[in-house]
Structure formats: C-alpha cells, structure tokens
Amino acid sequence: MGKVIGIDLGTTNSCVAVMEGGEPVVIANAEGSRTTPSMVAFTENGERLVGQQAKRQAVTNPENTLFAIKRLIGRKFDSDAVRRDIQISPFEIVKADNGDAWVDVRDKKYSPPEISAMILQKMKQTAEDYLGEKVTDAVITVPAYFNDSQRQATKDAGKISGLNVLRIINEPTAASLAYGLDKKSEEKIAVFDLGGGTFDISILELGDGVFEVKSTNGDTFLGGEDFDQHIMDYVADEFKKEQGIDLRNDKMALQRLKEACEKAKCELSTSMETDINLPFITADQSGPKHLNLRLTRSKLESICSSLLAKLVEPCRMALKDAGLSASDVDEVLLVGGMTRMPAVQAKVQEIFGKTPNKGVNPDEVVAIGAAIQGGVLKGEVKDVLLLDVTPLSLGIETLGSIMTKLIEKNTTIPCKKSQIFSTAADNQPAVSVHVLQGEREMAGDNKTIGRFELVGIPPAPRGVPQVEVTFDIDANGILHVSAKDLGTGKEQSIRITASSGLSDEEIDKMVKDAEAHSSEDKKKREIIEARNQADGLAYSTEKSLKEHGDKIDEETRNNIQTALDALKAAMEGDDPEDIRQKSEALATASHKLAEAVYKQTQEGAEAASEAGEQSAGDEGVVDAEFEEVDEQNK
C-alpha cells in the first residue's frame, strides 16, 4: 500500500496533506501556496485551468470560470438553495436529465462531481510532485451536515479523479484529530467550522486516543460566499444610488466586485477600516465610472448581522443533542477561514461563554486530520479510535405518508438497524420502499434518497406478510438498504446512490473522460517542454551563425539554416517527437559551427596567454632617462 493522502475539498479553497515520518505535512502546490482555490475555468482555445490559474483569469472570463461548485454537489436543480445560487451565479446552472443541478460551460454540461474531480486531480498531482511517486489512495473530507446524496457525490468525484477513496470523513472530526492526537487527558470539545460555503458544529469527547462524536449540526448553505454576497449587494446598492448604474447586470464588473469585497472582508479582520477602489468599473455616455467606497468593520458586521445570527441555533441544537450545556465544553476549536472574522469569534464566545481556541491553522487543520485518518487506516498511526455519527435521521415512508425512522440522527457509525413491516392492502404483490433522510414527521417534508421495490410477495391478507427492512450505514456515512420477505426469503437491496445521483455508467464515462484529459494534459506538457528546449537551441544557433558564420564553408552554413528552418516549422506543430527529431538534426548540423566557435575561443585564449607571458618577461625592466656626457668638455 502506497501513501494515503488527506484532502480537504473545500468550497473556496482545497488543501492536501500526507503523513511523513509519523507527522502530518501540508503540501504546497506548484505555485508555492499551501491552499489551492477550488476553481475550474475553460478558456476560449479549449484549455482547462484549475486552481490559481483559473482564479487569475476569472475577471475576464466570468461565465466560464466555476467556483463554489461544492454548494451544488448532490443537490436538486429545483431546491431552494440552488434557486438562490442561480440568481447570483455568473456561470450557467442547468437541470440535468435526472433532476440534479449541473453546469453548462462552452456548450458542454458537467456534473458537480465531475468539476470536483478536476480539483481533486490537481490536489493528487500536487501530492505526486512532492512525493515523487504515484498516489491512488485518499481520505476526503465533507461537511458533517452533508446528507447521503452529497457524500455519495463526493465519493463519485474521487472515483472520477482516479482516486481510491478509502474513507469519507467529517470536517470537524478531522479537525479534532489534528487537535487532539497528542492529548491524553479527557475533555469535551466543540468544533466550530465556518468555511467558504458550509457551517458545521460538532461536539466531541476526546480521551486516550478515542475521538467520540456526541452530536453534530449545521447549515450546508452558510459560509464565506454568503458573507461576500451580502457585502457585494451593499456596495452595488451604494454605487447605484451614486451613479444610477446597477453593477449586477455586468458579469465582468461583478467578478471584479466579488474579488474586491472578499479582499475587503479579509482586511477588516485585522484593521478597523478599508477602501474598496475599482477604477473604470463601468461606463456610460458621460464616460468611465470609478468605484471608491470606505468600509468599516462595524459596517461590515451590520451588513452581515443576519448571517451571524444564523450561527446560534445549530450550536444550541448540537449542545442539546449531546446532553450538555455550554459550560460543560472545555475547548471551542475554530476551523475554516471565516472564523478569522472578529464578529464570528465574538459570536462563538457569546454562545459558549469562553474564549475560543485559535491554536490551529483554520485553513489547514482539516487536511491534516484527513492525513492522520489515512495514517490510521494504513496502520501508521496506532491507538486512535474514531467514533463518528450520522448527522440526519434515516427512515422509510409508511402508511399515511409518515416517515418511520429506523436510525436516529447522531447515531454512532458504522451501524445496522432492522425493522419488520407488513403490507397495507390485501393480496399486495409488491412493497415499494421509499428511503428518506431528515427530521420532519411527514415523508414529503424530508429528502428522498432512494426508492426500490420488493416484488413476488405471495397473495395474503394485509398485515400478514412480514417484510424486514434493514438499514446499514458504513464508516463513510453512506447508506445500504435491503428488504427481505421473511415468508419466501426473497431479498432486494440497493446501495443508496441518491435518487438522482450518477449511475455507474455515467461515472465510468466520466472516469474515461478524466483519464483522456489527463493524457491530453501530459501531451500538452510534453509539447511545451519540447518547444522550450527547441526554442533555446534555435536562439543559440542563430546567434552563433550571425557571429561566426563566416568561419565555416557555405555548404555547412546552408545545412544549418535548412535544419533551423525545419525546427522552426516543427515548433509550429503539435508533435513533440517531431520537434525532438528536428532539434537533434539541428544539433548535428551545428557541430562544425560549434567547432569553429570553440577553435576561435581557444585561439583567443592562447593569444591572450602569449601576450600575458610577453608582459611577464618584461617584468623587472626599469625605464630611465639618461644624458650623454661630453668628456672633452669636462
């Protein structure tokens, strides 16, 4: 078994870590940064950019630059959350055949797991460049409050990217692993995780290598992106009041505004006020317009007050479900970039009545925890037991459209529960099992995560046949459901892939596409490297030909020029092998020129040496004036 990497697949940024010599190490990407923007862009010439490269060109290519795709993963197009995103997204969100939310870029539709896979491939490449070996195994983190569909979609993304996902682990749980690995004393901690797109709160008990999650709660549509949006709306409204132009109608201006608002938000974590300056943001008949606005920390807090208020209830529910009061919590751990905001820290202090612990890096701690979990699975990290929970209740629809829960929320996983049901009508030949996830009493108010039928039930009065329904949640928090007719022994089972998730055929196709794209990327890299080397050779040959061409015969000179022209023509093409061959041909043809240059250099050195010896031989000779004396005149 090779190295197991830990990946924090974030809404705004992603991070990768690995265990090295018993210690987790965060790996910097090719640009030298320890986190990578979770962005994918498609350029006009068909190139795909991921990470920092995608972010750099977002302003000039807003419609084809995808960000915060994690907010769409495992979601229906018709859901309220997606509807809200459609209003503000510069790229096009469309309805897939299965009802999911997909994106349409340059006339091609992509599923969120496919886009996430591109980000995962970038993280995989980062790890491989650092380790110098191929990586196939990974532990990937998800928000604790992700439902079954979202977890399955994340696992699909891993598969599409060419990774073998050993475990899906909750982000707060990963953070607790990073925090408590070396702690021996027993303590109760709250992990407050507010990232770019999601909010989680988990209550855990740590002690002697056991990490037990007592409860979890959260909001999968609350994070830094929402704070940015509130600031953008405020700034756009102020600009409209002043200039009469709504920047929200201009996608390019909106992308510039988004970046400026995000920067201002970050700056206000350390300073009391900042300026948002965007020259030439737009124009009308009177000429160009500039945006210049001063934003104070107190104004930012009032703009985002409704979002800050949303942080309270999940914390209260998590404490209640864990059977604890705020005073029972020993430490509150801050995770996610948004927890750097002073107002968020003040809200945490208000909820828990204590100063939060800022001892971990909020951007890296989740990836570090994932790497530690990878070490646990590989056997590198000993004496660690992780007991996670399922965030939402699971059950089936029964007579009267009621949801009958088989597994309650905050049940430790893996777990298995069975219950016996019967038919609702006489001589009923089949039972439809409608699998639900959520906390509401009525089936229609909860999320459908799968349906299947158990057929072939022998005719009998209602209430007589006995059908055993079994729910089995694995360590990834992914559900497997089976139904068995105890009378005939007939069984029907499904692994819940979400009622609208990707089919195995679709995943296989996406895996092939990703592999093809990977080989395309490799070929592009080969071409670029071959061109770069050829360009260097062509430049030095041309320079030498200009300076020393007169020292070789005309035939040799013509041969070199022909080989040079052939190489330049090859560099225009896309065949790296052809470029390499033409480079070798030019190198061979240039041998005589190189000899002439070498000979001249040697002759020059010899001449300089002789001149040096001559001057050295004259050393000790003193020039003196002299006067002839006429002896006779004495």
Curated annotation (Swiss-Prot):
Composition bias type Low complexity, residue spans: 602-619
Positions of modified residues (Phosphothreonine): 198
UniProt KW DNA repair keyword: no
One term of GO molecular function: ATP binding
Ranges of biased composition (kind: Acidic residues): 620-634
PROSITE patterns found in the cross-reference section: HSP70_1, HSP70_2, HSP70_3
Region of interest called Disordered, as start-end residue ranges on this chain: 599-634
UniProt entry keywords in alphabetical sequence: ATP-binding, Chaperone, Nucleotide-binding, Phosphoprotein, Stress response
UniProt entry tagged with the keyword Cell cycle: no
Induction profile: By stress conditions e.g. heat shock.
CDD domains named in the record: ASKHA_NBD_HSP70_DnaK-like
Gene3D superfamilies given in the database record: 1.20.1270.10, 3.30.420.40, Actin, Chain A, domain 4, Substrate Binding Domain Of DNAk, Chain A, domain 1
Family: Belongs to the heat shock protein 70 family.
The protein's name: Chaperone protein DnaK
Organism (species): Syntrophotalea carbinolica (strain DSM 2380 / NBRC 103641 / GraBd1)
